[in-house]
Amino acid sequence: MKVLVVDAGGRGNAIAHAFSRSEQVKEIYIAPGNGGSEFFEKCKIAELDGKKIPSIRAIDEIVRFAKKCEVDLAYIGPEEPLSLGLVDRLEEEGIPAVGPKKEATILEASKCWAKDFLKRIGVPIPEYANFDNPEEAKEYIREKFNNGIVVKADGLAAGKGVYVCDSVEEALRAVDEIMVQKKFGEAGNRIVVEERLRGIEVAFTAMTDGKTVKPFGHARDYKRAFDSDDIEGLRDFYIGLTKKFYTKAQIEQLYREGKLINPNTGGMGAVSPHPAVTEEVEQRIMEMVVEPIIENFDKEFKGVLYPVIMLVEENGELIPKVLEINVRDCDPGAEAKLPRLKSDMAEISMAVVEGRLDEVEMRFSSDYCVAVCAVSGALKGREGLKPGYPADHYTSQPITGIEEAMKEAIIYANGIAKTNGYVTTGGRVLTVVGMGQSIEEARSKAYSALEKISFPGMRYRRTIGLDVPE
């Protein structure tokens, strides 16, 4: 069996790794992939006429490759090619694909639409309002602010369009960045403003063939760029961002007063599973959230449904409330949960495209995985000091220690290229995954492996998993 995985980062490499463990699979192609996509057996970068596929947006080239290589199955990782209709195109050519068609991506492509849909079908959500006028949004924030508020760009923003605000000033700045300064382009033409919930946030995934829907693992995701006590890191970031000098004390005061934020990212790490998601809680999420979405959504949907859940305690029970919906697997949550998958990835995927998911059992190891992202941090170079991920960062920095780190942990490449050695190409560079019978054992393996890796400007959060009870 030949499988094509469409992705450019760590999630795609984790998906390919899961397929590589199936005896049914002989070859796995990753398009466009990256310099670490061939870390695992059976995996190779897709090439068309001797050239790599240029990007996840190169729909024509991806379809041509799939036809030419006669792949038996395609699995789409990111939201962008899904929203561009890649599954539609592949199926037109007779190539089965795991992922929703273009019209079904509205669930992720418009947060405003999704919030209205969830409210209509009775799925628990935070109090919210949608806006296409920044001044009206600001007026609402001034009236409604109570212990935090969240501002979200309506459209696709690579996981960076969400601002979790601790003060009115932060929220007003978020509105300006999204709607006035157009930080995310047309994705910020509309916004969602919602109450900030307190609880346990979980990236919950389910797999569906359009009829049957089953849990597909979950993770605790870490979005903030810096640990809460990493004032030195915040200082370097904001000096690089604003080109102004700050002392550590000034940054600490501005941070405490809510005049600067710890920025959100696509993800700095993840832990899977979370002990709070017991069988009872998982069933509650399925019954209150996942099943109603699939049953009431009027468009064909097959593939991964990924609602971001806040588990809020009410009357002694953890109640799931949906923060947003995604139509693909989580990242870096996938890197934390897929190493635990014991079921055959190829068998699951074929059951999805053939409409017989009811015949397949989803089994995950009881082990814990802790995934920590090594990112391109603040670095001074030819163009001066750059702030680093999630803002502008240097690339082409040499990486050492990957092979040594592989002896202790699983390494998924997010943004690297292979030349004479390995060099950085992105903000998120590597996701290092430790696996063990306890969270502490998994953390120890991940951080021990990270100490063996080095590149200029490298940084990572040091507290991933510390807040998760055993």
Curated annotation (Swiss-Prot):
Top enzyme class: ligase
Protein name stated in the entry: Phosphoribosylamine--glycine ligase
UniProt: Mg(2+) binding residues: 324, 326
Pfam families named in the record: GARS_A, GARS_C, GARS_N
Cofactor: Mg(2+); Mn(2+)
Gene: purD
GO molecular function terms listed in the Swiss-Prot or TrEMBL record: ATP binding; metal ion binding; phosphoribosylamine-glycine ligase activity
Keyword check for Cell inner membrane: no
InterPro entries, sorted: ATP-grasp (IPR011761), ATP_grasp_subdomain_1 (IPR013815), PreATP-grasp_dom_sf (IPR016185), PRibGlycinamid_synth_ATP-grasp (IPR020561), PRibGlycinamide_synth (IPR000115), PRibGlycinamide_synth_C-dom (IPR020560), PRibGlycinamide_synth_C_sf (IPR037123), PRibGlycinamide_synth_N (IPR020562)
Domain ATP-grasp, residue spans: 115-354
Binding-site residues, ATP: 142-203
Pathway(s) this gene product operates in, as recorded in its UniProt entry: Purine metabolism; IMP biosynthesis via de novo pathway; N(1)-(5-phospho-D-ribosyl)glycinamide from 5-phospho-alpha-D-ribose 1-diphosphate: step 2/2
Top-rank taxon, per record: Archaea
Cystine bridges: none
PANTHER family attached to this UniProt entry: PHOSPHORIBOSYLAMINE--GLYCINE LIGASE (PTHR43472), PHOSPHORIBOSYLAMINE--GLYCINE LIGASE, CHLOROPLASTIC (PTHR43472:SF1)
Keyword 4Fe-4S part of the UniProt annotation: no
Entry EC no(s): 6.3.4.13
GO biological process, one term: purine nucleobase biosynthetic process
Keywords linked to the UniProt accession: ATP-binding, Ligase, Magnesium, Manganese, Metal-binding, Nucleotide-binding, Purine biosynthesis
Catalytic activity, as annotated: 5-phospho-beta-D-ribosylamine + glycine + ATP = N(1)-(5-phospho-beta-D-ribosyl)glycinamide + ADP + phosphate + H(+)
Cofactor annotation remark: Binds 1 Mg(2+) or Mn(2+) ion per subunit.
Lineage summary: Archaea, Methanobacteriati, Methanobacteriota, Archaeoglobi, Archaeoglobales
Family: Belongs to the GARS family.
